[in-house]
Amino acid sequence: MYDTQVMIVGAGPTGLTLGIELARRSISFRLIDAAAGPFRGSRGKGIQPRTLEVFEDLGIIRAILKAGVQYPGFSVHIGPLSLRLGPMGGRKRATEGVPYPNLWLLPQYRTEQILRERLAQLGAQVEFGTAFERLSPDNRGVRVHLSSGESVTAEYLVGCDGGHSAVRKALGLGLRGDTLHTEAAFVADVHLEELDHTDWHVWPFAKGGSIALCPLPDASFFQLMSPREPADGIEAAILRATGCQVRQVAWSSMYRPAVRMVDQLRVGRVFLAGDAAHLHPPTGGQGLNTGIQDAYNLGWKLAHVLRGGPESVLDTYEAERLPVAAAVLGLSKHLYRTRSLKRGDATNQLRLHYRTSTLSLGKPLGRLHPGDRMPDVRLADDTRLFEQMCGTHATEFVTREGARILIRPDGYIASIGTQRVTSYAGEPTHVVDGSATDLDRSSIHS
């Protein structure tokens, strides 16, 4: 007898996304977090285009777009000279295939708040002040021991509890990789009224490194980034660089830039996701986004198996996400080493794919392969394909040539063929007439 189907440890963006995915499929779960209350810092402030597509499916894209802004341009200050540069990643126009082409700026605490509000709409909530202590796995489930003294038996446990993951440590798994800098770096949210709020300001140091202030959507707040905590205090360091007085320090944190990951994402009935499985430096805005993608990949698979689907489906979580984590870590490391302000298409996560997955079947159709992200297209009735895909179902897209593209619940192509597929992952497929569309024009793959 189980107390709940899934126990989720950690209520950051990864755990919240997983909770939403389970809640909208009517899977019972508990979502616990050791913190006394919600996270209040801006830390993971960059939301990539692929994550914005996920947020459309989760039903929160309007709230996310309303609360955030496009990334600002840079002002680099060297003595009396100020150079104004374009925004990170440039500014791209939305296309038929890519409705959200630009990196979106939103403080992490606000992203989490919107995710919690969506979770509440689905009838669930976070249990703050409840810590995971240890686990007792067996073949039928996982017994989770909590700081309250309670023991909970779940069919599956998912550790989404960050870089210092207690779940990962309980499994005996280590993080392999590199520490990129021997000294801890510093980040803080500061209130400045005198500094121009339209640009991301950077003051390079003569011996390397810089102090930077990125404007946040909240009026007059900036995210401060520094190679180390200023010896004479935040206020003095900012006054020295900018001539501006700090009105408030709302949040601050130290971190040691690293690229590290586990060798496996699953041990029996226990899974790891997000920073519990892979640690990223802040460069490239990959950490928060990769964790959300982990949860988005795992959620529908857990639900399918809990409804009677084959257990082997869960093996594809590690098979699909571990190579992605390795690739993203490599990109983050490169961006950190080069210190480049330029961002190419590699950071937007739109080209990540699962072509080698056992769930990807059939032959390519033009530039589209099984395992690719399905592009958005405008349909004959003037709706968008992504609108038709929203929900927990898989979608079957029928081309003008009669090919049938089966799209998984997470937006990736499961198969390309000619046979009608009536159900996928335990739910009826939704058929979409794509006879009036040009897929090659929408695809970003080659």
Report residues per predicted region.
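Conserved FAD-binding catalytic core of PHBH/FMO-like flavoproteins
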Residues: 117, 156, 160-257
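Active-site-adjacent segment of FAD-dependent monooxygenases/related oxidoreductases
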Residues: 43, 48-118, 216
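N-terminal Rossmann-fold NAD(P) dinucleotide-binding loop
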Residues: 15-16
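Helical substrate-recognition/capping region of FAD-dependent monooxygenase/halogenase enzymes
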Residues: 1-5, 9, 24-25, 34, ...
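A conserved short coil-to-beta-strand element within the FAD-binding core of flavoproteins
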Residues: 128-142
